[in-house]
Amino acid sequence: MSQPITRENFDEWMLPVYAPAPFIPVRGEGSRLWDQQGKEYIDFAGGIAVNALGHAHPELREALNEQASKFWHTGNGYTNEPVLRLAKKLIDATFADRVFFCNSGAEANEAALKLARKFAHDRYGSHKSGIVAFKNAFHGRTLFTVSAGGQPAYSQDFAPLPPDIRHAAYNDLNSASALIDDSTCAVIVEPIQGEGGVVPASNAFLQGLRELCDRHNALLIFDEVQTGVGRTGELYAYMHYGVTPDLLTTAKALGGGFPVGALLATEECASVMTVGTHGTTYGGNPLASAVAGKVLDLINTPEMLIGVKQRHDWFVERLNTINHRYGLFSEVRGLGLLIGCVLNADYAGQAKQISQEAAKAGVMVLIAGGNVVRFAPALNVSEEEVTTGLDRFAVACERFVSGGSS
């Protein structure tokens, strides 16, 4: 008989880089999860914007099981049908001409930055290596991507960091313009800063970055790891803004919970990559590709994308009602189903405490820094689940302002 598993086992056995909740989920269906004790939670965290179709979606299970009964992996010495079908779906749905598959958002961003450096070196010379990113950004945890992310708390322990990366103020075109010049090979930006507080870019900011990149022969990289695959009510957020990047990274929701990432590129950009310039053992795995292909089939429809915008209104209307009662938030912001509630000055730094109260009340939410409570639910979350979950969130807010649950 196997040994019972408890939350304490995490503290005994795992590298202490996370501080997970005190309960362990064991089963999910749609936007509901149940823990080891049978307690139900409405899931508005979505695995950090990953579970775009909720838990255990029947068509995703079917796609996974069908491929699992055939073969699981061959390595990049061979291609496979699911990955080629997935590549064609992404190309047909976006600006891209070529796709590189990997396993995560960090890997996709790493590939994008490497491609941008090689593109600049091949076309203009090795002096053109500068990367401009933005303060409070998040692009992953590899040494290259954590350096591009503009949050020193994540990178300061790992010096020396890769050179030639500079950070401008987000949504400040003058700040970016002061850093972008003819030595810049790429600008990497999130259309909405997710980990940085759910801060949407302005249209003028992204349009201005496109113009600056064109002027200085730099590639514009959109990190759509969190905003992509329907999250904003468009398949990718660049469509919402009407600004087309040269490279786009996608992951998280692309696999609906199965690990997969991708770099989308124009033909011109992709042409500098040749056999051996980059690679990954698991990228384009047929299991991941089969699931991701079904995710795209289900999400890239007018009904689903219009529904995301409708669900945004459900959330914002109810969150504003809750805020009117308890006065916790200075702003409710975001696009589609990436929503941030910004704590007012009286409650600054206490987002984590609110998320903990929410879990006690039976609803899972995220934070984005110390001052923002973040919602990233499934794109198909039902109106009943939204109502029930936000009823529970209201209970959590009441407990928080009254000093916490007993």
Swiss-Prot record:
CDD domains: OAT_like
MF-aspect GO terms: identical protein binding; pyridoxal phosphate binding; succinylornithine transaminase activity
GO biological process: alpha-amino acid biosynthetic process; arginine catabolic process to glutamate; arginine catabolic process to succinate; ornithine catabolic process
Class of this enzyme: transferase
Domain of life: Bacteria
Coiled coil: none
N6-(pyridoxal phosphate)lysine: residues bearing it: 252
Gene3D superfamilies on file: Aspartate Aminotransferase, domain 1, Type I PLP-dependent aspartate aminotransferase-like (Major domain)
Transferase recorded as keyword: yes
Cofactor requirement: pyridoxal 5'-phosphate
Protein purpose: Catalyzes the transamination of N(2)-succinylornithine and alpha-ketoglutarate into N(2)-succinylglutamate semialdehyde and glutamate. Can also act as an acetylornithine aminotransferase.
Family designation: Belongs to the class-III pyridoxal-phosphate-dependent aminotransferase family. AstC subfamily.
Protein name: Succinylornithine transaminase
UniProt lineage: Bacteria, Pseudomonadati, Pseudomonadota, Gammaproteobacteria, Enterobacterales
Record gene name: astC
